Amino acid sequence: MHNDGCDKKLRHAIKHDTEHEPKFVLFTRPDVNTTQDLFDNDTELNVNLTLNLPTKIIVHGWKSDIRLTPLVDMKNEYLLREECNVIFVDWEKLAAEECYLHAIWHTTYVGQRVAEVIRKLRDTGAEDIHVIGFSLGAHVAGIAGFLLRPYKIPRITGLDPAMPGFIFASNSEKLDSTDAEFVDVYHTNVLMQGKIERSGHVDFYMNGGVTQPGCHERSNCDHTRSAVYFAESINTEVGFWGWPCPNLWEFTIHACPPTTRLRILAGDNVDKSARNYYIVKTNAESPFATRDL
Protein backbone atom coordinates (compact mmCIF):
# COMPACT_ATOMS: atom_id res chain seq x y z
CA MET A 1 0.00 0.00 0.00
CA HIS A 2 1.41 3.38 -1.00
CA ASN A 3 0.45 6.54 0.90
CA ASP A 4 3.28 8.79 -0.28
CA GLY A 5 2.02 12.27 -1.01
CA CYS A 6 -1.49 11.58 0.28
CA ASP A 7 -3.35 14.87 0.52
CA LYS A 8 -6.82 15.06 2.04
CA LYS A 9 -7.68 18.00 -0.20
CA LEU A 10 -7.71 15.69 -3.21
CA ARG A 11 -10.54 13.75 -1.64
CA HIS A 12 -12.92 16.45 -2.83
CA ALA A 13 -10.96 17.78 -5.81
CA ILE A 14 -11.26 14.67 -7.97
CA LYS A 15 -14.46 13.03 -6.84
CA HIS A 16 -16.89 15.04 -8.96
CA ASP A 17 -14.65 15.64 -11.97
CA THR A 18 -16.58 14.43 -15.04
CA GLU A 19 -13.39 13.01 -16.54
CA HIS A 20 -13.13 10.70 -13.54
CA GLU A 21 -16.80 9.73 -13.52
CA PRO A 22 -17.34 5.95 -13.31
CA LYS A 23 -18.54 4.41 -16.55
CA PHE A 24 -20.91 1.48 -16.92
CA VAL A 25 -20.11 -0.90 -19.75
CA LEU A 26 -22.61 -3.49 -20.99
CA PHE A 27 -21.88 -6.85 -22.59
CA THR A 28 -24.56 -9.12 -24.08
CA ARG A 29 -24.89 -11.95 -26.54
CA PRO A 30 -24.30 -12.67 -29.38
CA ASP A 31 -21.06 -10.67 -29.63
CA VAL A 32 -19.66 -11.03 -26.12
CA ASN A 33 -16.62 -8.86 -26.90
CA THR A 34 -18.48 -5.78 -28.09
CA THR A 35 -18.50 -3.00 -25.50
CA GLN A 36 -21.68 -0.99 -25.18
CA ASP A 37 -22.53 1.98 -22.99
CA LEU A 38 -25.16 1.02 -20.45
CA PHE A 39 -26.96 4.30 -21.07
CA ASP A 40 -28.07 5.88 -24.33
CA ASN A 41 -28.12 9.69 -24.18
CA ASP A 42 -26.94 9.60 -20.55
CA THR A 43 -30.32 8.67 -19.08
CA GLU A 44 -32.03 5.96 -21.14
CA LEU A 45 -30.93 2.36 -20.68
CA ASN A 46 -29.33 0.66 -23.66
CA VAL A 47 -31.94 -1.08 -25.83
CA ASN A 48 -29.83 -4.26 -25.79
CA LEU A 49 -30.29 -4.57 -22.03
CA THR A 50 -32.96 -7.22 -21.38
CA LEU A 51 -34.46 -6.52 -17.98
CA ASN A 52 -36.05 -9.94 -17.44
CA LEU A 53 -32.66 -11.65 -17.77
CA PRO A 54 -30.13 -12.10 -14.95
CA THR A 55 -27.89 -9.05 -14.54
CA LYS A 56 -24.29 -9.39 -13.33
CA ILE A 57 -22.50 -6.23 -12.20
CA ILE A 58 -18.71 -6.61 -11.87
CA VAL A 59 -16.57 -4.10 -9.95
CA HIS A 60 -12.76 -4.09 -10.18
CA GLY A 61 -10.32 -2.98 -7.48
CA TRP A 62 -7.39 -0.62 -6.86
CA LYS A 63 -4.98 0.03 -9.74
CA SER A 64 -7.09 -2.25 -11.88
CA ASP A 65 -9.65 -1.97 -14.66
CA ILE A 66 -12.27 -3.94 -16.58
CA ARG A 67 -9.54 -5.57 -18.66
CA LEU A 68 -8.24 -7.63 -15.72
CA THR A 69 -8.05 -11.15 -17.15
CA PRO A 70 -10.07 -13.07 -14.53
CA LEU A 71 -12.84 -10.46 -14.67
CA VAL A 72 -12.98 -10.74 -18.46
CA ASP A 73 -13.04 -14.53 -18.04
CA MET A 74 -15.95 -14.12 -15.63
CA LYS A 75 -17.90 -12.12 -18.17
CA ASN A 76 -17.21 -14.67 -20.89
CA GLU A 77 -18.18 -17.62 -18.69
CA TYR A 78 -21.50 -16.03 -17.78
CA LEU A 79 -22.36 -15.24 -21.39
CA LEU A 80 -21.28 -18.72 -22.45
CA ARG A 81 -23.63 -20.28 -19.91
CA GLU A 82 -26.76 -18.22 -20.44
CA GLU A 83 -28.43 -15.18 -21.88
CA CYS A 84 -27.73 -12.42 -19.39
CA ASN A 85 -26.60 -8.83 -18.98
CA VAL A 86 -23.04 -8.31 -17.79
CA ILE A 87 -22.23 -4.78 -16.64
CA PHE A 88 -18.72 -3.65 -15.74
CA VAL A 89 -18.26 -0.70 -13.40
CA ASP A 90 -15.28 1.09 -14.91
CA TRP A 91 -13.84 3.36 -12.23
CA GLU A 92 -10.27 3.00 -13.49
CA LYS A 93 -9.41 6.71 -13.29
CA LEU A 94 -10.33 6.85 -9.61
CA ALA A 95 -8.88 3.43 -8.80
CA ALA A 96 -5.56 4.37 -10.42
CA GLU A 97 -4.62 6.66 -7.51
CA GLU A 98 -1.03 6.15 -6.38
CA CYS A 99 -2.21 6.99 -2.90
CA TYR A 100 -4.28 4.02 -1.73
CA LEU A 101 -6.13 6.20 0.80
CA HIS A 102 -7.46 8.34 -2.04
CA ALA A 103 -8.78 5.22 -3.75
CA ILE A 104 -10.51 4.25 -0.50
CA TRP A 105 -12.13 7.69 -0.31
CA HIS A 106 -13.44 7.25 -3.84
CA THR A 107 -15.24 4.00 -2.98
CA THR A 108 -18.05 5.99 -1.35
CA TYR A 109 -18.68 8.00 -4.50
CA VAL A 110 -18.42 4.97 -6.78
CA GLY A 111 -20.75 3.06 -4.45
CA GLN A 112 -23.26 5.91 -4.74
CA ARG A 113 -23.12 5.74 -8.52
CA VAL A 114 -23.54 1.95 -8.50
CA ALA A 115 -26.54 2.33 -6.18
CA GLU A 116 -28.09 4.86 -8.58
CA VAL A 117 -27.69 2.45 -11.49
CA ILE A 118 -29.15 -0.47 -9.54
CA ARG A 119 -32.09 1.71 -8.50
CA LYS A 120 -32.67 2.58 -12.18
CA LEU A 121 -32.49 -1.10 -13.17
CA ARG A 122 -34.88 -2.10 -10.39
CA ASP A 123 -37.36 0.68 -11.17
CA THR A 124 -37.50 -0.39 -14.82
CA GLY A 125 -38.13 -4.06 -14.06
CA ALA A 126 -34.85 -5.84 -13.31
CA GLU A 127 -35.10 -8.33 -10.44
CA ASP A 128 -32.24 -10.84 -10.69
CA ILE A 129 -29.28 -8.60 -9.82
CA HIS A 130 -25.92 -10.00 -8.68
CA VAL A 131 -23.03 -7.65 -7.86
CA ILE A 132 -19.51 -9.13 -7.84
CA GLY A 133 -16.72 -7.02 -6.36
CA PHE A 134 -13.01 -7.82 -6.36
CA SER A 135 -10.72 -6.40 -3.66
CA LEU A 136 -11.63 -2.72 -3.17
CA GLY A 137 -14.54 -3.35 -5.52
CA ALA A 138 -16.10 -5.63 -2.91
CA HIS A 139 -16.48 -2.64 -0.59
CA VAL A 140 -17.92 -0.56 -3.44
CA ALA A 141 -20.58 -3.27 -3.76
CA GLY A 142 -21.18 -3.19 -0.01
CA ILE A 143 -21.55 0.59 0.04
CA ALA A 144 -24.08 0.38 -2.82
CA GLY A 145 -26.03 -2.25 -0.91
CA PHE A 146 -26.04 -0.11 2.24
CA LEU A 147 -27.27 2.96 0.35
CA LEU A 148 -30.13 1.07 -1.30
CA ARG A 149 -31.82 0.10 1.96
CA PRO A 150 -34.55 -0.88 2.69
CA TYR A 151 -34.31 -2.57 -0.72
CA LYS A 152 -31.77 -5.38 -0.71
CA ILE A 153 -29.75 -6.48 -3.70
CA PRO A 154 -30.48 -10.20 -4.20
CA ARG A 155 -26.80 -11.18 -4.07
CA ILE A 156 -23.36 -9.67 -3.56
CA THR A 157 -20.18 -11.71 -4.02
CA GLY A 158 -16.99 -10.42 -2.42
CA LEU A 159 -13.72 -11.62 -3.92
CA ASP A 160 -10.97 -11.21 -1.31
CA PRO A 161 -12.36 -7.92 0.07
CA ALA A 162 -9.52 -5.48 0.69
CA MET A 163 -8.16 -5.35 4.25
CA PRO A 164 -5.91 -2.22 4.39
CA GLY A 165 -8.00 0.72 5.52
CA PHE A 166 -11.05 -1.36 6.45
CA ILE A 167 -10.15 -3.02 9.75
CA PHE A 168 -11.97 -0.34 11.76
CA ALA A 169 -14.37 0.85 9.05
CA SER A 170 -18.07 1.04 9.88
CA ASN A 171 -20.52 -1.27 8.14
CA SER A 172 -21.66 1.63 5.96
CA GLU A 173 -18.15 1.81 4.47
CA LYS A 174 -17.42 -1.85 3.77
CA LEU A 175 -18.99 -5.12 2.68
CA ASP A 176 -20.88 -7.09 5.31
CA SER A 177 -23.73 -9.60 5.46
CA THR A 178 -26.44 -6.93 5.79
CA ASP A 179 -25.75 -5.45 2.34
CA ALA A 180 -27.73 -7.99 0.30
CA GLU A 181 -30.19 -10.82 0.70
CA PHE A 182 -27.22 -13.16 0.28
CA VAL A 183 -23.53 -12.30 0.56
CA ASP A 184 -20.88 -14.91 -0.28
CA VAL A 185 -17.19 -14.12 0.19
CA TYR A 186 -13.99 -15.81 -1.03
CA HIS A 187 -10.75 -15.22 0.88
CA THR A 188 -7.38 -15.92 -0.75
CA ASN A 189 -4.84 -13.51 0.78
CA VAL A 190 -5.97 -12.70 4.33
CA LEU A 191 -3.76 -10.57 6.57
CA MET A 192 -1.98 -9.25 3.49
CA GLN A 193 -4.29 -7.71 0.91
CA GLY A 194 -7.54 -9.34 2.01
CA LYS A 195 -9.66 -9.25 5.16
CA ILE A 196 -9.47 -12.17 7.57
CA GLU A 197 -12.79 -11.64 9.33
CA ARG A 198 -16.08 -12.87 7.98
CA SER A 199 -17.82 -10.44 5.66
CA GLY A 200 -20.78 -12.45 4.39
CA HIS A 201 -23.47 -14.96 5.21
CA VAL A 202 -20.95 -17.58 4.12
CA ASP A 203 -17.19 -17.11 3.85
CA PHE A 204 -14.95 -19.51 1.97
CA TYR A 205 -11.27 -19.58 2.90
CA MET A 206 -9.61 -20.98 -0.19
CA ASN A 207 -6.75 -23.29 0.80
CA GLY A 208 -6.94 -21.69 4.24
CA GLY A 209 -7.22 -18.19 2.81
CA VAL A 210 -3.66 -16.94 3.36
CA THR A 211 -1.64 -18.08 0.34
CA GLN A 212 -2.57 -20.09 -2.73
CA PRO A 213 -0.83 -23.14 -4.22
CA GLY A 214 1.09 -22.23 -7.35
CA CYS A 215 1.61 -18.60 -6.28
CA HIS A 216 5.33 -18.57 -5.56
CA GLU A 217 6.30 -14.94 -6.04
CA ARG A 218 5.37 -11.92 -3.98
CA SER A 219 2.82 -10.33 -6.24
CA ASN A 220 -0.93 -10.09 -6.63
CA CYS A 221 -1.19 -13.79 -7.47
CA ASP A 222 -2.75 -14.89 -4.16
CA HIS A 223 -5.13 -11.93 -4.08
CA THR A 224 -6.24 -12.29 -7.70
CA ARG A 225 -6.86 -16.01 -7.34
CA SER A 226 -10.20 -15.19 -5.71
CA ALA A 227 -11.43 -13.87 -9.06
CA VAL A 228 -9.75 -16.69 -10.98
CA TYR A 229 -11.48 -19.35 -8.88
CA PHE A 230 -14.86 -17.64 -9.11
CA ALA A 231 -14.65 -17.32 -12.90
CA GLU A 232 -13.87 -21.03 -13.19
CA SER A 233 -16.72 -21.92 -10.83
CA ILE A 234 -19.36 -20.59 -13.23
CA ASN A 235 -19.15 -23.51 -15.66
CA THR A 236 -16.94 -26.13 -14.03
CA GLU A 237 -18.31 -29.67 -14.02
CA VAL A 238 -16.04 -30.59 -11.11
CA GLY A 239 -16.99 -27.85 -8.68
CA PHE A 240 -15.18 -26.18 -5.79
CA TRP A 241 -16.13 -28.04 -2.62
CA GLY A 242 -15.82 -26.75 0.93
CA TRP A 243 -16.12 -28.28 4.36
CA PRO A 244 -17.11 -26.45 7.55
CA CYS A 245 -14.62 -25.15 10.08
CA PRO A 246 -15.45 -22.98 13.13
CA ASN A 247 -12.55 -20.61 12.46
CA LEU A 248 -9.13 -20.37 10.84
CA TRP A 249 -7.33 -21.19 14.08
CA GLU A 250 -8.97 -24.60 14.24
CA PHE A 251 -8.04 -25.19 10.61
CA THR A 252 -4.43 -24.21 11.37
CA ILE A 253 -4.16 -26.73 14.24
CA HIS A 254 -5.91 -29.41 12.13
CA ALA A 255 -8.96 -29.47 14.39
CA CYS A 256 -11.47 -29.52 11.50
CA PRO A 257 -10.35 -32.18 9.00
CA PRO A 258 -12.06 -32.46 5.60
CA THR A 259 -15.42 -34.22 5.59
CA THR A 260 -17.48 -35.19 2.56
CA ARG A 261 -20.60 -35.60 4.68
CA LEU A 262 -20.95 -31.87 5.32
CA ARG A 263 -19.34 -30.49 2.18
CA ILE A 264 -21.03 -27.81 0.09
CA LEU A 265 -20.44 -26.30 -3.34
CA ALA A 266 -18.62 -22.96 -3.39
CA GLY A 267 -18.56 -20.40 -6.19
CA ASP A 268 -21.25 -19.08 -8.47
CA ASN A 269 -23.56 -22.03 -7.84
CA VAL A 270 -23.30 -21.88 -4.05
CA ASP A 271 -26.27 -22.94 -1.94
CA LYS A 272 -27.77 -19.65 -0.73
CA SER A 273 -28.78 -21.22 2.56
CA ALA A 274 -25.08 -21.77 3.42
CA ARG A 275 -23.76 -19.97 6.50
CA ASN A 276 -20.51 -19.50 8.46
CA TYR A 277 -16.94 -20.62 7.62
CA TYR A 278 -15.85 -23.15 5.00
CA ILE A 279 -12.45 -24.30 3.81
CA VAL A 280 -11.96 -25.08 0.10
CA LYS A 281 -9.04 -26.96 -1.41
CA THR A 282 -7.92 -26.27 -5.00
CA ASN A 283 -5.34 -27.48 -7.45
CA ALA A 284 -2.14 -25.46 -7.90
CA GLU A 285 -2.83 -24.78 -11.57
CA SER A 286 -5.76 -24.50 -13.96
CA PRO A 287 -8.20 -26.15 -13.83
CA PHE A 288 -8.25 -25.33 -10.12
CA ALA A 289 -11.42 -27.17 -9.14
CA THR A 290 -10.85 -30.56 -7.55
CA ARG A 291 -13.11 -33.22 -6.07
CA ASP A 292 -10.46 -34.00 -3.48
CA LEU A 293 -10.85 -32.59 0.02
Locate the predicted segments by residue:
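Flexible, membrane-associating and regulatory peripheral segments of lipid-active enzymes
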Residues: 1-88, 95-106, 116-124, 149-151, ...
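Glycine-rich nucleophile elbow surrounding the catalytic serine of serine-hydrolase chemistry
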Residues: 60, 132-144
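Non-catalytic cap/lid and distal C-terminal segments of serine-dependent acyl enzymes
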Residues: 106-107, 140
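Alpha/beta-hydrolase fold nucleophile elbow
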Residues: 124-135, 156
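Active-site nucleophile loop of the alpha/beta-hydrolase fold
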Residues: 155-165, 187-191, 209
